[in-house]
Regions:
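A cross-kingdom feature marking charged/low-complexity
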Residues: 317-331
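Short acidic, glycine-rich surface-loop motifs adjacent to enzyme active sites
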Residues: 145-158
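Substrate-binding N-lobe of the ribokinase-like
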Residues: 4-5, 33, 37-105, 316
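Positively charged, low-complexity intrinsically disordered leader regions
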Residues: 1-29, 328-329
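Active-site metal-binding loops of divalent metal-dependent hydrolases
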Residues: 18, 154, 270
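Conserved phosphate-binding/catalytic loop of the ribokinase/pfkB sugar-kinase fold
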Residues: 87, 94-101, 108-143
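Conserved post-catalytic alpha-helical subdomain immediately downstream of the catalytic base
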Residues: 231-232, 257-320
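Conserved phosphate/ATP/ADP-binding segment of small-molecule kinases
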Residues: 156-251
Length: 331
């Protein structure tokens, strides 16, 4: 396994739905007399960049250099998003403003480490081809020096069929690794990429299977691998870990390494960032999946949108509690 220090040499493009994660932190002491709902006493508020921006933040935390591409609305929230990004470790980003569009915001009310409610503000219509061309031009100018491309699809309208097809072709023509966190039931949109990282429900629904059915992971994994001809497929399964499928190989399951699960918000972002960075650094699919699994186990133990860091991951690996899972680390 390549050392985590090798991540600092990586340059990775992230294209996807950028959003603002807003948290209202408080406490609940009573039920409202007006309706059977809790009354939250607001104690604190915080803002963090989410969605594709959280993928980029995880890459930066790992020491890689992310190049983030996304869109925002022509509203005050878009200005807030720019301000949050400017204060983050993401130093290279192009967030294109689109007239008449709302900046995607997810507002979460949290009390006693529990989500009380989430409020979404968004525009989900696909962007125009003209807007897509602006992004594609910027991407084409730097892609020669890039090690990998991550596509983070939250189905908020950025990744139109036009943009997706052109982006995949551009990356593959340059022989870049393309890793996708997919959305929706039609995974054929991602044909031509190297790897996708859906969760169990997404994989099952894309294969027209019941997510709760027996061996939904195995059946959907084999179906997706066959139809898309991927190099690999990593299906995340929450508290049950994740399963890696590779072309011509038996599925490889990894049990979750999480000691406590407080919040799964952004865990998929951590998985794809770590997995893609590990692949770009020269690791094989199994070692990359092991690192992604370890990173996910760390972040789900924290409340709110959070990111992995190289030091946190290194400390986790150095403890030796899971040495049997990382024999190749010292090979």
């Amino acid at each position: 396994m390549q050392a985590l220090e090798d991540f600092s040499q990586l340059k990775i493009i992230v294209v996807g739905d950028v959003m603002l994660d807003r948290y209202w932190w408080g406490s609940v002491e009573r039920i409202s007399p007006e309706a059977p709902v809790p009354v939250v006493r607001l104690e604190n508020m915080s803002l963090v960049a989410g969605g594709a921006a959280n993928v980029a933040a995880n890459l930066a935390g790992l020491g890689a250099i992310p190049y983030l591409f996304g869109i925002k609305g022509d509203d005050g929230e878009g200005d807030q998003l720019e301000r949050v990004l400017s204060e983050s470790e993401i130093k290279s980003y192009l967030i294109t403003q689109v007239a008449g569009r709302k900046t995607t915001i997810k507002t979460r009310v949290v009390a006693h480490h529990q989500h009380v409610v989430r409020i979404d503000q968004e525009t989900r219509e696909s962007i125009s081809n003209e807007t897509a061309d602006i992004l594609l031009l910027q991407i084409s100018e730097i892609i020669d020096d890039i090690d990998a491309v991550i596509i983070s699809d939250y189905a908020k309208g950025l990744l139109s069929d036009y943009l997706l097809k052109a982006l995949i072709k551009t990356a593959r023509d340059k022989k870049k690794i393309v890793v996708v966190d997919p959305k929706g039931n039609d995974f054929t949109r991602y044909k031509g990429v190297n790897v996708i990282t859906p969760n169990k429900r997404e994989a099952a629904e894309a294969s027209e299977l019941d997510p709760m059915s027996f061996d939904a992971v195995g059946c959907s994994g084999n179906s997706i691998m066959g139809s898309l001809r991927l190099d690999a497929l990593l299906i995340t399964e929450g508290e049950n870990g994740m399963t890696l499928f590779q072309s011509g190989e038996q599925p490889f399951h990894l049990d979750s390494l999480a000691q406590d699960v407080f919040d799964v918000t952004g865990a998929g972002d951590t998985v794809i960032a770590t997995f893609a960075a590990a692949l770009a650094a020269g690791n094989n699919f199994i070692d990359s999946a092991k690192l992604a699994n370890a990173a996910a186990g760390i972040v789900v133990g924290k409340v709110g949108t959070t990111r992995i860091t190289r030091s946190t991951l290194a400390d986790f690996l150095a403890k030796g509690e899971h040495d049997h899972l990382f024999e190749s680390l010292h090979a």
